[in-house]
Structures are given as structure tokens and as C-alpha cells.
């Protein structure tokens, strides 16, 4: 865990980079659970986040460039966890927001957003605050 300069102790971040392949997603699920536990999330909140991160990664892996790297940045800010997963993609399309997968993400993580960089890297950002019910910030 590293600290972001400027605000000692209030913003920590962890970055995990791994091959963009489903076989490695267990690493991110474990990291998600560990970091959410560090913020004293409930067991239900931890499980919701694990599933949300897994789903976000699954969405990205469908269009990831073969042999590329999946990046996951966790930011711990107060009683909230921000998770951003990103991968270079073949087509640079943002995930459709009217899909079942997006509905699941929104229900489990609270706030969900996506972006596409000029180099066709697609990112999905999740935000969950401790104590917020499903689908709430």
C-alpha cells in the first residue's frame, strides 16, 4: 500500500497488474476482499465488491487485446474504496450501460463509471462507501 502525496494517511492506493486472462482474476478478488476488510466493510459488502470487481474484469477481458495487461488500482479514501480496472482493447468501446452486467455492477458497487482513452484502453471505475446499502454510494 502506498500513500498519495499531499494527504498523509487519508488516501492509500494499491495497484495490481496482471495478464489479461481469467485465470488471474482470483488475485484481484483476494486483493479486493483484503482491502475492503481493512476498511471494516461488512462481510456482505466485501462479497459484493469481490463480485463487482470480478464482473468489471470479465467485461474488459471480452475485448482485451490478447496478451495484454489488466491493471487494477484500489484507492482507500476515508471509509470508501475506489476500484478502477483497465485494459487495452481491440475496439476501444465503452461497456454498454443497458446490459445485465452493468446493472449488476451498479447494484453491487454503488457508483460505476467507464471511460475510453485515446489508445483504446477502457477503464471501469467502481466506488463503494462502507455502510452504504446495495446500489448506494
Regions found by a protein language model. Give the residues of each.
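Bergerat-fold GHKL ATPase/HATPase_c domain
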Residues: 1-51, 137
